[in-house]
Amino acid sequence: MDTQSSIGNEEWRIAGTSVVSGMALGKVFFLGTSPLHVRELTLPQEEVEHEIHRYYKALNRSKSDIVALEQEVTGQQGLQEVSSILQAHLEIMKDPLLTEEVVNTIRKDRKNAEYVFSSVMGKIEESLTAVRGMPSVVDRVQDIHDISNRVIGHLCCQHKSSLGESDQNLIIFSEELTPSEVASANSAYIRGFVSLVGAATSHTAIVSRAKSIPYLANISEELWNIAKRYNGKLVLIDGYRGELIFNPKPATLQSCYKKELSVVAHTSQRLVRKSLHPIVSSHAGSDKDVEDLLENFPQTSIGLFRSEFLAVILGRLPTLREQVDLYEKLARFPGDSPSVLRLFDFGEDKPCPGIKNKKERSIRWLLDYSVILEDQLQAIAKASLQGSIKVLIPGVSDVSEIIEVKKKWETIQTRFPKGHKVSWGTMIEFPSAVWMIEEILPECDFLSIGTNDLVQYTLGISRESALPKHLNVTLPPAVIRMIHHVLQAAKQNQVPVSICGEAAGQLSLTPLFIGLGVQELSVAMPVINRLRNHIALLELNSCLEITEALLQAKTCSEVEELLNRNNKITS
């Protein structure tokens, strides 16, 4: 189609990648993305101390911004990970070495604060960018970039438009979106996001998904520039097909919404065979999440409680009493199966407040800090007096790690009265765990496959990186076969398996999980009803057929083609 002739009031469609699925309608709004203009100025000696004062003032205002935003997101369901990111921003801004370098450079070179700060942060960004292949490097680069823009914005009195102040339905277009921007968005009016680049496992996507805001990314620059001419016009995000539809016709709107409407209308008419459809459970990460789930979905189990978020919310490690109080609520939760409590999952991009250790993560981090692990196990032992709990060990790469944790548990539980059953499970997130699954299974009562990390470590990418075009699919063939391998072994050992991560809530993959025999899908609370309704529309034979085809796929493009074709058949 000739894009030039499409500009005006005619309907125009462009393709992107659906990062967060769903439908969204609103006016196009391009968020200001022009880089802040930083001039280099040489100051008279008598103005140097005033310039340093100006820097401190901008830095303190930036800290206040982050503290205010953190307080805002702390109480919101599903946004604890954002709080962790904001804590990392604060830690960087509080770093005395950073402040010392900026202040000393202003004094020594007599340059203006914004120029010096921009130069210092630029060097840090360059050093991080040079380290290729390390997980989460892109996350850190984005953090540095975000902090730099915030401080320089205060110095230059320039700021992006606030996403919390809109009073009309908008689809936000931005070359690059940060998690803090998405977290601050007023979801009553910000209906969708579109960016030049983006990945389904990025922090930005996780926040957008938690807020149930559809998100489309990876638009070509040529089409992006043409889309700017539609600023203020109506646009529809079709997150199921990965399309942007500018000036949608009434017939298009009716057709696009038909899928979601039909889900509600036909839920009671078609059911997957009993015992063959997966249980849908919910993520949680705070006391408020548990209360919200109890209020809205009292019979829904907690499929993944991220215990480290308690430390993030408090800004410190929780006391034994604080842990016991929270874990007792999990033990008493009236879901249809016991709550799953993941042990502290610190390290790398999720630092523990007050402890700097970036060498290890997950269970290896915990074993390095055995006192912290033993305190958590004591809290679990006390909470088990109130009810059954499932304990999930994160980031296992070798069976010896499971054995060591369980040995500590055996010692600790003898100090307390015998409580209800405590089951033990393992997160399958690393390829090493997949290929040692036969050795891991005898130590486990259940398994949980973390698709985000499994994809990341299998393909050798970071969470924030946009996948190369030939790999741009939520589950590449290698990971599909890994999941199949784990499920086959688990079935032989009669060990149930759940899926958590971005893939669990992606409706196009639900037939695959049913066909593979997944027993549980753990998703964010806003996705629960949509996923259950979708499952109710699926036929078992069709699920088995698409699963067989996907297991034979050799490339990501084949996977995408099969999923798109199946999506059209079932829609």
Curated annotation (Swiss-Prot):
Task of the protein: General (non sugar-specific) component of the phosphoenolpyruvate-dependent sugar phosphotransferase system (sugar PTS). This major carbohydrate active-transport system catalyzes the phosphorylation of incoming sugar substrates concomitantly with their translocation across the cell membrane. Enzyme I transfers the phosphoryl group from phosphoenolpyruvate (PEP) to the phosphoryl carrier protein (HPr).
Gene assigned in the entry: ptsI
Catalytic activity: L-histidyl-[protein] + phosphoenolpyruvate = N(pros)-phospho-L-histidyl-[protein] + pyruvate
One annotated Gene Ontology cellular component of this protein: cytoplasm
Protein's UniProt keywords contain Transport: yes
Protein name: Phosphoenolpyruvate-protein phosphotransferase
Binding site for Mg(2+): 429, 453
GO BP terms, alphabetized: phosphoenolpyruvate-dependent sugar phosphotransferase system
Keywords: Cytoplasm, Kinase, Magnesium, Metal-binding, Phosphotransferase system, Sugar transport, Transferase, Transport
One MF annotation (Gene Ontology) recorded for this entry: metal ion binding
